[in-house]
From Swiss-Prot:
One term under GO cellular component: plasma membrane
Family designation: Belongs to the PhoH family.
InterPro entries for this protein: KH_dom, KH_dom_type_1_sf, P-loop_NTPase, PhoH, PhoH2-like
Record bears the keyword Lipoprotein: no
Protein name listed in UniProt: PhoH-like protein
Length: 352
């Protein structure tokens, strides 16, 4: 390298150094452990998700990097401090969702989103964990009918049931009705062994599991016997008018258009309906069109009906679930079949 090149490189390095900024945030001493996490797991999550360099000494967090990166890191850490100060446990998952919210286009505060209590029982509190979940919950409060559409693990059914239980406990409604289509995955009830109740129960088991997670297990059978809580197949809704009820239709992608119309027209006075489903997991036979897809197309412009969409970003199960959802979405994109066939053919030729 010539002396001219050396001087140019030094000048470029100096300009880059000048562009770097430093900032320091003092964390209240009693919140440091909660912010950093067990064995500094939250700090490591911050280091993985933020571009700015982080250094912790005592209760001071020093940030260094490009101005925009440092500004984002300041916002993230301030929000996380507010979350810890509210008494909520901070986890790497909460860190990841908080960063995603602030990187996005919304103006919502992660501390406000992640500390919104929906339902509490024996020290366990159910809250939205992502911005879209918060918007979904707000839509349920503001509208009579809400469609919650998204992949597995986005909390669409669990949050709807939490809102239903809360509405019952606060006397906004007098009963809860939980329903699902009773035929899924290509099975027919008539070919399954057991009584009708024994055949139907496995399809409704996820709803029972969620109920027992939210309410006193000893109270649930009494409420069901009194008709305050009803868990039933969708076919049992026909011919009824459901007043003063919070009604949740789960797995709605497996309804036909006729079933969906029948269900929605059961709506009575003082009732609220939440319809949840995943349009990528339709099990209807013969390629029949999903009633959920049809309803969204037909009803999306009607006032007091809201369509809430959740994505892989809102998956709150294991981190891999979000990646699996995205991988399947890419695999099933139009035209990707040709690419898969080409890859298989190429692989076959390579094995010869």
């Amino acid at each position: 390298m010539t002396s001219r090149e050396t001087r140019a490189a030094d000048a470029a390095g100096a300009r880059q150094a000048d562009a770097q900024v430093r900032s320091s945030i003092d964390v209240p001493p009693d919140l440091v452990v909660g912010l950093l996490g067990s064995a500094d797991e939250n700090l490591r999550a911050l280091e993985r998700t933020l571009s700015a360099d982080l250094h912790v000494r005592g209760n001071a967090v020093t940030l260094c990097g490009e101005p925009a990166d440092v500004a984002l890191a300041e916002r993230v850490i301030s929000e996380l401090i507010a979350i810890v100060a509210s008494g909520q446990s901070l986890t790497p998952e909460v860190v990841r969702h908080s960063v995603a919210m602030l990187v996005g286009t919304g103006n919502e505060s992660p501390a406000e989103v992640l500390t919104l209590d929906i339902l509490s029982r024996r020290g366990k509190t159910i809250r939205p964990k992502t911005l879209n979940q918060k918007r979904y919950v707000d839509a349920i409060d503001a509208n009579t009918i809400v469609f919650g559409i998204g992949p597995a693990g986005t909390g669409k059914t669990y949050l709807a049931m939490a809102k239903a239980v809360h509405a019952l406990q606060t006397k906004q409604v007098t009963r809860i009705i939980l329903t699902r289509p009773a035929v899924e995955a290509g099975e027919r009830l008539g070919f399954l062994p057991g009584t009708l109740s024994e055949k139907i129960d496995p399809y409704l088991r996820p709803l029972y599991d969620a109920l027992y997670d939210m309410m006193d297990p000893e109270l649930i059978p009494k409420l069901m016997s009194a008709g305050v809580i009803e868990v039933a197949p969708l076919a049992y809704m026909r011919g009824r008018t459901l007043n003063d009820a919070f009604i949740v239709l789960d797995e709605a992608q497996n309804t036909t258009a006729e079933q969906m119309k029948m269900f929605l027209t059961r709506l009575g006075f003082g009732s609220k309906v939440v319809v949840t489903g995943d349009v990528t997991q339709i099990d209807l036979p013969g390629g029949a069109r999903s009633g959920l897809r049809a309803a969204v197309d037909i009803l999306e412009d009607i006032d007091d009906i809201h369509i809430a969409e959740l994505t892989s970003v809102d998956v709150v199960r294991h981190r891999l679930v979000s990646e699996i959802v995205d991988a399947y979405a890419r695999y099933e994109e139009p035209g990707s079949g040709l690419n898969r066939a080409a890859r298989r053919a190429s692989g076959a030729r390579g094995r010869r």
